[in-house]
Amino acid sequence: MRKLALDDEILLTIEKPARYIGNEVNAVMKDKSEVAVRFAMCFPDVYEIGMSHLGIQILYDMFNQRDDIWCERVYSPWPDMDKVMRDKKIPLFALESQDPVKDFDFLGITIQYEMCYTNILQILDLSGIPLLAEKRTWDDPIVIGGGPCTYNPEPLAQFFDIFYIGEGETVYFQLMDLYKEERAKGSSRMEFLKKAAQIPGLYVPALYEVCYKEDGTIASFTPTDASVPASVEKQIVMDITDTYYSKAPVVPFIKATQDRVVLEIQRGCIRGCRFCQAGMLYRPTRERDVEFLKQKAVEMLDATGHEEISLSSLSSSDYSQLPELVNFLMEECDRRGVNISLPSLRIDAFSLDVMKKVQDIKKSSLTFAPEAGSQRLRDVINKGLTREVILEGAGKAFEGGWNKVKLYFMLGLPTETEDDMKGIAHLCEEIAERYYEIPKDQRNGKCQITASTSFFVPKPFTPFQWAPMCREEEFLDRARIVREEIHAQLNQKSIRYNWHEADVTVLEGILARGDRKVGDAILKAYEHGALFDAWSEYYHPEYWKEAFAECGIDTDFYTIRERSDDEIFPWDFIHIGVTKKFLLREWKRAHEETVTPNCRMQCSGCGAAKYQGGVCVESKS
């Protein structure tokens, strides 16, 4: 009989106890005495967020298909539970077995966003695992990190044994088999790590040394062991139809953020937005076969009982078999009484026709992401979306019965001027005017336009990785300019405006392009009490300011400084296919306000063609 790690007294006093009891529908249970490798798969945020993550669902299913591996799940305890565990000295446990995480062979942590870095330390701390990798022994799990933030792993280097660079379906089993062999041989932990570092895509920070120049930039990044490669190559699955995909995702006991079946239709994006990290990291664009997707949709709906299905992609409209897939899903979902969610669609005639059929027009809103207020700045960022297309799409939507529009913009983009900022208000006004051109008896109530601005953060492996970012007060000044210009518009009552927190954005920028020195501040901030920094109610900027000051870190060095063309970045040792030469060329083209065509229109020579697949070979086949 499985025994819960928490007694009834605790479960009755904490918020949402179902976060911690496991045993959900489709959770995988095994006999731990019959497996060779125990793997704790962690999302370092609250259960509802982590349970929504598709990547963990895929890897959980993939690992558990092997009889010799048992993969279990673990999430960050919410602050109330965190306090109980510390007060009562309860170690962090995995959901399936309820066993302490420290008893596992591996702790795999997916790192999706920078603001969860202190939660990673919480996971290690509550598990009784030394925070610093150099202090761990075979009594501790191998701590491995994956996900988009590992494309600059350096701020977290001292906390991880291994970073997995690339897509999870590639070399994990090779690592598991190596682990079994080395443990059977009685190898030391370091002997295992040295051999792991020879597996393509695996980065062991302890085996590399960084030297700095007097100005704080990197002078060199070199392996300390001759057997270790000088660079780490991203691992990628070229045929994403012939790979793992969950048939029966775990169904949470409580409502998750994404409480639905998720169908990943493709990876990558053909659009070369110069601010977008995902668009560069996941090149080349690869599509799943439509028949495979139809089969998976049916299997997952059967296995979960979910009442909604969503298509996952960076740009769903670019999926070449979208009409066939959507028509199938509409018929299948109508038969089952299931809703369809279609994010990342361009607003064109086909999309509007589909959305009319699958959405309640009175309740739903259409979303555009112009990103910039002027055509000049949209050309700088290579958005590929014109004012005419936006207004035409909004007009068709209004004529179709919609009256709610959401618009997403960024402030602080390279070369941005006051005219660009005010252009956000002017575009909102033009959309409102387009609505009120419709005869009154044909309108669906009052027009509601919501404009949201986030603040620009330069990310590694983008053309804007050389760019300076704004200070906190500069971001807020720009938001005020937009707000005041909106208030000056004729249809201001139809336009709502909100913006992201500027102080959080600056911290994200420091962590995104940080080096190993930043890791000391992460540790210090955690010691001061930083936790759940992505949640505004728990974010304390003073913890971070104190941490940077105590560590002698000048935060301006990581944020407002424009990088020189030849600077060595902390992440330059990672090769993602897309070359630094191409990114620099795009940085120059941005300043020239020159648009680069998308991958289906013309190859831009980014370097991803080396993988010999996906969109890079479409025109040749």
Model-derived segments and spans:
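N-terminal pre-triad scaffold of radical SAM enzymes
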Residues: 41-45, 63, 249-277, 301, ...
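A short beta-strand-loop structural module common to alpha/beta enzyme folds
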Residues: 67-80
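Glycine-rich beta-alpha loop elements in corrinoid/cobalamin-binding modules
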Residues: 77-223, 463-515, 522-537
